[in-house]
């Protein structure tokens, strides 16, 4: 789960991480009032959407007086920002962060991520702050420094100091930088983050180390023990189909293709997408109905797939281990009738009660194309979609 920058900064502040003072605003008048309350000579007006690249898209403006705050708030609120992370459709700006300006001396990057290769959290840092870390990794990888963190003991002070020296934090500010990184790590662990990224981390003319931006992502599977974080969820920033899918415990991720996929199990779902691509098709989604799919869940899965106007056909690929193929077959038939499906539908069943499942499909009288294997099903749906 993602949260907004201002929410992430509030979380980090509670862990002793230094961030600029700021206030969220939902209207132009609130933005002006927030700037008044901050009482600083310079304010930064920042669009709040779940995407990076806001500055390049015109979503971050420096205001030197209240009139400029009003002008920038009017120009940003309600507009659609298109960045490299939003896709061509962009995201509408519904809230702003009004923040005090900083006398920036130098920008850095600091982030915590999970390294799946080592099964450890890794602290990454670079003196090339303010730019995409992927770009730094591609062009100047030698400027990225890493510290792998033993989960048994956590981030150690010497590791944070080594990072600070490697990225050339001024010696007199190393102590602050170490405190910053230790606080960031505590937030990452205690709040079950999957990413904690500060870009940029800055040193200021006043001799401070601060987070000028904050990106926190959380492990959705751990949200049951973080009610405070769950309350920060902004449904306006999420795909409506993903929200609907979550209501029925369906794992749905939209893609750009035209072949809808309904599969049980994440591994089989990925294999299904791969084989569709192998036969020159394009999957429209990843949809895992899980191990205990009912007729209701199958029906809802169909509705979610069909809500994507790009879908021209559906491939149902089920291995009946925990669930039974006859139950899935009945669910597919019920769903087909309920939604009045007119698109090509290919169904491949294998596993428990597979013969009964196939019999139910064959005797349904519906235009359902049966497949004998995953490859057969992929070829058939690609051919039918054209």
From Swiss-Prot:
Residues binding Mg(2+), per UniProt: 199, 213
InterPro entries noted in UniProt: ATP-grasp, ATP-grasp_succ-CoA_synth-type, ATP_grasp_subdomain_1, SUCC_ACL_C, Succ_CoA_ligase-like_bsu, Succinyl-CoA_synth-like
GO terms under cellular component: cytosol; succinate-CoA ligase complex
Binding site for substrate: 264, 321-323
Keyword Metal-binding included in the entry's annotation: yes
Reactions mediated catalytically: succinate + ATP + CoA = succinyl-CoA + ADP + phosphate; GTP + succinate + CoA = succinyl-CoA + GDP + phosphate
Cofactor note: Binds 1 Mg(2+) ion per subunit.
Keyword vocabulary terms for this entry: ATP-binding, Ligase, Magnesium, Metal-binding, Nucleotide-binding, Tricarboxylic acid cycle
Pathway the protein acts in: Carbohydrate metabolism; tricarboxylic acid cycle; succinate from succinyl-CoA (ligase route): step 1/1
Class of enzymatic activity (EC top level): ligase
Chain segments annotated as coiled-coil in the UniProt record: none
SUPFAM superfamilies referenced in this protein's UniProt entry, alphabetically: Glutathione synthetase ATP-binding domain-like, Succinyl-CoA synthetase domains
Function: Succinyl-CoA synthetase functions in the citric acid cycle (TCA), coupling the hydrolysis of succinyl-CoA to the synthesis of either ATP or GTP and thus represents the only step of substrate-level phosphorylation in the TCA. The beta subunit provides nucleotide specificity of the enzyme and binds the substrate succinate, while the binding sites for coenzyme A and phosphate are found in the alpha subunit.
Quaternary assembly: Heterotetramer of two alpha and two beta subunits.
Protein name: Succinate--CoA ligase [ADP-forming] subunit beta
Originating organism: Bacillus cereus (strain G9842)
Phylogenetic classification of the source organism: Bacteria, Bacillati, Bacillota, Bacilli, Bacillales
Gene field: sucC
């Amino acid at each position: 789960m993602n949260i907004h920058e201002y929410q992430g900064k509030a979380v980090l502040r509670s862990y002793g991480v230094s961030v600029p003072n700021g206030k969220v605003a939902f209207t132009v008048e609130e933005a002006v009032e927030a700037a008044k309350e901050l009482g600083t000579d310079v304010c930064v007006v920042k669009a709040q959407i779940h995407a990076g690249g806001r500055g390049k898209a015109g979503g971050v403006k420096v205001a030197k007086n209240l009139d400029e705050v009003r002008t920038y708030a009017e120009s940003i609120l309600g507009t659609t920002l298109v960045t490299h992370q939003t896709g061509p459709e962009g995201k509408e700006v519904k809230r702003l962060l009004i923040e005090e300006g900083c006398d920036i001396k130098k920008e850095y990057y600091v982030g915590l991520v999970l390294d799946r290769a080592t099964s450890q959290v890794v602290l990454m840092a670079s003196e090339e702050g303010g730019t995409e870390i992927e770009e730094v990794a591609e062009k100047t990888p030698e400027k990225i420094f890493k510290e792998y963190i033993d989960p048994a003991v956590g981030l150690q002070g010497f590791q944070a100091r080594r990072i600070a020296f490697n990225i050339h934090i001024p010696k007199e500010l190393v102590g602050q930088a170490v405190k910053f990184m230790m606080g960031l790590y505590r937030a990452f662990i205690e709040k079950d983050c999957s990413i904690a990224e500060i870009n940029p981390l800055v040193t200021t003319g006043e001799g401070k180390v601060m987070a000028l931006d904050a990106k926190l992502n959380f492990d959705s599977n751990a949200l049951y023990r973080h009610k405070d974080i769950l309350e920060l969820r902004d449904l306006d920033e999420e795909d409506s189909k993903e929200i609907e899918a979550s209501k029925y415990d369906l794992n749905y991720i939209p893609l750009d293709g035209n072949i809808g996929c309904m599969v049980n199990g994440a591994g089989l779902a990925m294999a299904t997408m791969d084989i569709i691509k192998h036969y020159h098709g394009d999957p429209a989604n990843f949809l895992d109905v899980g191990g205990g799919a009912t007729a209701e869940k199958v029906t809802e899965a169909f509705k979610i797939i069909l809500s994507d106007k790009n879908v021209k056909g559906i491939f149902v690929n089920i291995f009946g281990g925990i669930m039974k193929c006859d139950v899935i077959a009945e669910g597919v038939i019920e769903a087909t009738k309920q939604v009045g499906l007119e698109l090509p539908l290919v169904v491949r069943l294998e596993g428990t009660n597979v013969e009964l499942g196939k019999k139910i499909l064959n005797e349904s009288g519906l235009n359902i194309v049966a497949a004998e294997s995953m490859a057969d099903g992929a070829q058939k749906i690609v051919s039918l979609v054209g």
